[in-house]
Amino acid sequence: MSYQRNSARASLDLRSQYQQLEGRMRSEHFNPAYQQQQQKGQNIPLSLPSSLAQRNPIPYPIDAVTSDPTIPAQLNVYDHDRQNSIVDAAAGTNTTHSLNSNNIPSSQNNNINNNNINNVGSFTDPSMLTLPKMSLHSHQKQYDSNQNDPRSPLAILIPTSAQPTDVLSARFSAWRNVIRAILVYLSETASIQDEIVRQQLRLSHAVQFPFFSIENQYQPVSNEDKSMQKFFLPLGSGSVQDLPTMLTKYHDNLASLASKSSKELTSEIIPRLEDLRRDLLVKIKEIKALQSDFKNSCNKELQQTKHLMKLFNESLKECKLGTPKSDPFLIKLQLEKQIKRQLVEENYLHEAFDNLQNSGAQLESVIVMEIQNGLTSYARILGKEAQVVFDSVISKLDSTILNKNTNLEWDSFILRNISNFVPPNLPMRRFKEISYSNQNDPFTFEVKSGFLEKRSKFLKSYSRGFYVLTPSFLHEFKTPDKHKFSTPLMSIPLVECTVTEHSKKTKSNSEQGKNKFILRTNSNGLIHRGHNWVFKVDSYDDMIEWFGNIKALSSLPNYDDKCKYVSKVAKLSKEKAKSNENTTESVTPQVTNEQHTRYDDVSSSNFPLNSIPKLDNLTITNTTSSIPETNDSQIQNRVPEFYIENVDSPRKSNQL
């Protein structure tokens, strides 16, 4: 019998015990005092036969299958997220390949391919071979702690290759054997009405728990019985495995005192347990149908995250050395997108574990409750006998399995099988809780972004594009929507650029929108000639800000100076954003005198322009990847694109 994923998962969810018991409890012979004690989590005392006579079993044929309308909706959302993550994974793989092929030399690519990512940080890492013994021990200890850190993107805290449905099916199959053993025992009890002595011997042999230990009498022999025994608490813990020992002792002590009434056994207790056992077989099939929910690609996503993390750290190292081949800003976008994709897959698997474990816990609670009800009814029958009956078995049942929480076995089972199940109180991880080294490095900041117009090389017309200025590059993107495009159409390394001049502030220029500046890329030989990039900005103040930032970043000599400058710009941006939030009236954005002075000082600084290293690193790529979302509500009216003008163009000075 086949099941769909969502329907199978939803069908396993059980109604609460109180909903299932509603309308099924008998009104006759129901003791209010016993109900009050049950609400307090206590069992009725078994010291008097009269109290047992008042304790009526609850007729409870299990009906564990219900449809919770909220569960399929949640599962559909997770299935949709998972499908999107798979599509994004394919797109992310292509984007990463494009980025690596353009920004990393072939020799470096070969080195990356030859290095095993899983080998990093382990004792087989060549960099670890020369460390002292204590350093190796400390490194391994730190590596193990990172694998269990819920904030680390390189840690997966839930099992990814487990088979929980097989384990749980085997567990409930063992429960069916427990119920079968109880049924055999109770059936034999109902047949000893006239032959007390002979029937007591029969009942002694009817205690058939092949995988449970019986004190001083029996121990499981076969491997199958021993494996089933591990599903339950050990002998002496007061749980279900103590039951066969107590029953055997009881029949040895009551060979001549048994006087039974089989009517209640054959009409109520046995049929209910038989219904429970039949329904449990259906539940086992439903559990096995959930096996496909635990097929996942978490390990594949983790390897991709490790790969991008390595590229991210290498790019930052290159930027700090002053010879960047790829921008950490772009790789960080790819890394964060991959982490989100990994968390979607991981949380889908986590949700599957939660659904299976919660449903299994509820199902086992019903099973244990049914066994408790059956044994309670049986104890009431035994209470009609002499005090020896009470001393031999009833008091022991009441102090052990009848008084245990229904989740006692389940909680112990989960804790003993932590490699196959998720701990009950383990929360799901969120992206905002993820942290990694160099996450807020200044070289990953966005110095400035917005729309610019760039003059075409041949048509002399201007096209519009969205630009992002980072400490190392000037990138052109197709749109400001960073969720759709994470790889730029074009990237210009600032180490190969200088800004030469900009237009003057005049009334006519402001009216006609002719606020321009020229960005020159240096020549790298015969193949890559220098170019003059002519950009046009809507306002003069905005042009000065672009000009000043590019001039400063392309002229700063080392990593520390760039970090100080970027931190200063970021601080000013935060102060400006805070002041805009406190303003209640809408005003035209203006650049303050302090900003004019700052950028004018930058534009007039004496940084050596000829000391810029020459790198053949101009990147022009097309992509469909996404970059983080950018609010473009304040730049809606500025929509330019980029073009290149040859350095030999004679019209450069005439058109400014």
UniProtKB/Swiss-Prot annotation:
Keyword flag Mitochondrion: no
GO MF annotation terms: phosphatidylinositol binding
Motif stretch (PXIXIT-like, required for interaction with CNA1 and CNA2, and calcineurin-dependent dephosphorylation): 640-645
GO biological process, one term: eisosome assembly
Keywords for the protein's UniProt record, in alphabetical order: Cell membrane, Membrane, Phosphoprotein
Cellular-component GO terms for this entry: cell periphery; cytoplasm; plasma membrane
InterPro entries referenced in this protein's UniProt entry, alphabetically: AH/BAR_dom_sf, BAR_4, PH-like_dom_sf, PH_domain, SLM1/RGC1-like_PH, Slm1_PH
Compartment(s) of residence: Cell membrane
Domain PH: 445-555
Record carries keyword Signal: no
Role: Together with SLM1, effector of the TORC2- and calcineurin-signaling pathways. Phosphorylated and activated by TORC2 under favorable growth conditions. Mediates actin polarization via inhibition of calcineurin-dependent transcription. Upon nutrient limitation or environmental stress, gets dephosphorylated by calcineurin, inhibiting interaction with TORC2, thereby antagonizing TORC2 signaling and mediating calcineurin-dependent actin depolarization. Also functions in heat-induced, calcineurin-mediated uracil permease (FUR4) endocytosis.
Any further remark recorded for this protein: Present with 2610 molecules/cell in log phase SD medium.
Oligomeric and partner information: Heterodimer of SLM1-SLM2. Binds phosphatidylinositol 4,5-bisphosphate, which is required for function. Interacts with the TORC2 subunits AVO2, BIT61 and TOR2. Interacts with the calcineurin catalytic subunits CNA1 and CNA2.
Protein name: Phosphatidylinositol 4,5-bisphosphate-binding protein SLM2
Species name: Saccharomyces cerevisiae (strain ATCC 204508 / S288c) (Baker's yeast)
Lineage: Eukaryota, Fungi, Dikarya, Ascomycota, Saccharomycotina
The gene coding this protein: SLM2
